[in-house]
Amino acid sequence: MTLGSKKRIQLMLQYIDIKPSDVLLDVGGNTGKITEVYAKECKAVVVLEPKHAVVEYGRTYRPHIKFVEGRVENIPLPDEYFDKVVASASFHHFPNQDRGLEEMKRILKANGKMIILEIDPTTGRGKRLKVCESILHTKAKFYEPFQLRKKVEEHGMKVLSVKSTSLGYYLTAVKGNQK
């Protein structure tokens, strides 16, 4: 677990507001270690992960969680299936962030919530992470909170809140009744 995981989990649970009837998708959930906490709170949880080896590990060591191999730009899951979609410290890694937002919106039920935890590139921690990402030659793209808010709104989602934390910021948005 990374990014102060224990604290991050507590904050995510607070912002996600999981209901026992919820079906939740964790985008870029890796091996499902954090997802395991969500699984205790909701009806069903799915991890979407692009790396085959990571998916196999998750399936082996967390058989109670469904792992789906795939990319956020083309989520291999049905329309309007999930009550909540969580992207915890993964959005900056999406190769095509606009397409990723469209797909996350597509698989959300009407009035479903999207929760994104991201690193704020204007903070000391965010600046250090950007340097690390550039050293590792990743193509990470970070947004300041107001920029991500605008991007999410451009995709037809209603932003309910953007809250800064010591770990970055949380953006919570809701999908309206439209498809």
How would you label these PLM feature ranges?
Residues M1-K6, K33-I34, L48, I115-T172:
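C-terminal alpha-helical "lid/dimerization" subdomain adjacent to the S-adenosyl-L-methionine
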Residues L3-P20:
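Conserved alpha-helix/loop element of class I SAM-dependent methyltransferases that forms part
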Residues V23, N111-K113:
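Short glycine-centered segments of the SAM/dcSAM-binding site in methyltransferase folds
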Residues L25, N30-N74:
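Class I SAM-dependent methyltransferase SAM/SAH-binding core
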Residues V86:
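A conserved beta-strand element that flanks and buttresses the S-adenosyl-L-methionine
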Residues L171-K179:
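C-terminal lobe and adjacent flexible extensions of AdoMet/dcAdoMet transferase-like proteins
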